[in-house]
Each structure stands twice: as structure tokens, then as C-alpha cells.
Design a protein with these regions (language model features):
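C-terminal helix-to-coil terminal segments
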Residues: 88-99, 116-117, 170, 255-311
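A charged, well-structured terminal subsegment
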Residues: 105-129, 282-283, 287-288, 294
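Phosphate/diphosphate ligand-binding glycine-rich loop within oxidoreductases
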Residues: 44-118
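N-terminal glycine-/charge-rich "phosphate-binding" loop or analogous flexible N-terminal tail
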Residues: 1-44
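Glycine-rich NAD(P)-binding loop of Rossmann-like domains
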Residues: 117-149
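Rossmann-like adenosine-cofactor binding region
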Residues: 168-262
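Short acidic low-complexity segments
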Residues: 31-42, 54-56, 173-189
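NAD(P)-binding Rossmann-fold cofactor-contacting core
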Residues: 157-173
């Protein structure tokens, strides 16, 4: 049987993915046809991004699974017409490695105090050595694929890393805490906080005034996860008071970030335009193709979304 695989995404574009998907699917040995315009009645799989025009999945009677090209699924997971398995993108070659590089780079930037040397209009000679990594406690909120990879990379550099997640995890070399009762403990005394949680009702404003108050004075906050994780007003107040020394933010409630947003003008905020990590077409295509192969072989799909949890 020839499978029909619909490409339904505005970003990334079909032009970017046509060749990598064709190559990856060809390597599986499956018979297939692939494209952005296929009859709904014949579609077996959808390679998807939530910005697609496809929002009514009930139009696809043969649909077996939806393979998301984005790591985040908050814009599709609650779709009542989606009644087949939904797999999120976990791309160790591209997405994960990119996040590790972004997080590690900004952790080292703040740990080493590089901003004082990069921006030094007074030409001051700041002869003050930074502490060693072993003396800089780091907390990572979120121990999914991205959070775990970042936590392991920082631990390998000598940072004492605490990881927190909704459910219990055991990861060699890390102090792992979980559940609402242990969130405060995970935050207590952290000098660098990294947010890599999904966007769910339970994580909205998880970094509020009470949470910020538990960090070490002069802490650094890095958010490459999701914009709604942060209570923006509380973070700005913490920056103004010095409770937080600096925040590096890659994601926001509204994107692009409005030009009049207070973050732009704040000297304690670094803004990057949602570039912490990108799905790479070549490696992502291999992830998608492997999941289709697994489905056709009767094997469980990888990276299935838990609808109840929202990620």
C-alpha cells in the first residue's frame, strides 16, 4: 500500500522540508506520496506545525498520527478534532544541541561576568575573578529532553545542578526534585535559574514574585522555554530591586515582542528573538520518517504527547 503523507505547516516551509523528508522517507523503504496538497480522504499521516491552516482533523478519516515539527504543542494539544496520536519534535541532532549551546553560552556569560567587560564605556579595569563553577548553584526547571540535556552539560562543566520536574526523575550527577511541594526547595539559593518547562495551565506564571524571592540575591534568570512561564511584572520588579541581576529572555507571551514593552528598555534584560534553538530540517525529517516507519511496523511512536498533561 502507498502511504499518503500530508505536509501541513507554514513555518517551516514546504520548500525547506521537501528534499530532507523525501530522502528520509526513502531510506525507510516505505512506499509513499508526500506533498502539501493531498486529498483529505486519503491522508494517512500529517507532518504538522500548529501555524498550519489545517485545524479540523476530522476531515481525515484515514489519519493514523500527527507528527509535530515544533517542540511545543500547546497550540494543538487541546484541539477536540484531533483523536489520533500526536508526537512532538525531539531532535537531538538539531533542536537539543542548539538549546544546549544557547543555555551553556549564556550561563557561562553570566557566571564569568562577561557583560562588565563587553560593555565598559568607562574603560574601567575590573580585576575581579569569577567564582569557579562548583561554587555557582544552578537550577533547571523542566527535565524533558531539552532540560535534561542542558542540565547534564552544565553538570559536566562542574556546576552543582538541581533539576525540577512535575514527576519524579533520576538523572546521574543531578539533584532531582519533583512536584509542587519541592518546587520551592529547587529554587532556594539558586544563582542561575533556567526555565525549560512546557506551556500548560500548571506552569503559567510559575516564576512569580514568591518564586523569585527564593532565588539567591543577584541571581540570573534565563528563559528559552515559554513566555508565559514568567510573571513579567514580578520579574521587572525583581530586576528593579536587584533581587535579580539580569534576565536573558528568548521567548515571550506576544511575539514579536511589542516595541513598547518594558523589557526592551531595561538595562537588566537581554532579549533574543526566539532563536535559542531551531528544528533543523535534515535531522527533524529523520525523526518524522522514523516515527512513520515505527507506526507502520506496529511499534510505539516516540515522543508521544500526554494529552492530559498538555505536553
Amino acid at each position: 500500500m502507498t502511504l499518503s503523507i500530508l505536509y501541513a505547516a507554514s513555518s517551516p516551509s514546504w520548500e525547506e522540508y521537501e528534499a530532507p523528508l523525501t530522502a528520509a522517507l526513502g531510506a525507510t523503504g516505505l512506499r509513499y506520496r508526500l506533498g502539501p496538497d493531498l486529498p483529505a480522504a486519503e491522508v494517512d499521516y500529517i507532518v504538522y506545525a500548529p501555524d498550519s491552516d489545517v485545524q479540523d482533523f476530522s476531515r481525515f478519516p484515514r489519519l493514523k498520527a500527527v507528527l509535530n515539527l515544533w517542540a511545543g504543542v500547546e497550540r494543538v494539544v487541546g484541539n477536540p478534532t484531533l483523536r489520533v496520536p500526536l508526537a512532538r519534535m525531539v531532535d537531538d541532532e538539531g533542536l537539543t544541541q542548539g538549546m544546549v549551546e544557547y543555555v551553556t553560552g549564556h550561563v557561562l556569560r553570566h557566571h564569568l561576568g562577561m557583560d562588565a567587560h563587553i560593555v565598559n564605556p568607562d574603560h574601567a579595569w575590573h580585576h575581579e575573578a569569577p567564582p569557579l563553577s562548583r561554587d555557582r548553584p544552578v537550577t533547571v526547571l523542566g527535565l524533558g529532553a531539552l532540560g535534561t540535556a542542558c542540565a547534564r552539560a552544565l553538570s559536566a562543566l562542574g556546576f552543582p545542578v538541581t533539576g525540577w520536574s512535575r514527576t519524579a526523575k533520576q538523572i546521574d550527577g543531578l539533584r532531582c526534585l519533583h512536584g509542587t511541594d519541592q518546587l520551592g526547595t529547587a529554587l532556594d539559593g539558586a544563582q542561575i535559574l533556567i526555565l525549560l518547562l512546557p506551556d500548560t495551565a500548571a506552569t503559567t506564571d510559575i516564576l512569580d514574585a514568591a518564586a523569585l524571592a527564593r532565588l539567591a540575591p543577584g541571581a540570573f534568570v534565563i528563559n528559552p522555554g515559554r513566555g508565559p512561564l514568567i510573571d513579567d511584572g514580578a520579574l521587572l520588579a525583581a530586576l528593579d530591586s536587584g533581587r535579580v541581576a539580569h534576565a536573558t529572555l528568548d521567548v515571550f507571551r506576544t511575539e514579536p515582542l511589542p516595541r513598547d514593552h518594558a523589557y526592551w528598555a531595561h538595562p537588566g534584560v537581554t532579549i533574543t528573538p526566539h532563536i535559542a534553538s531551531e528544528t533543523r530540517a535534515g535531522s527533524a525529517a529523520r525523526v518524522v520518517a522514523d516515527n512513520i516507519r515505527r507506526s507502520e511496523a506496529g511499534e510505539p511512536l516516540r515522543h508521544l504527547v500526554d494529552r492530559a498533561a498538555g505536553y
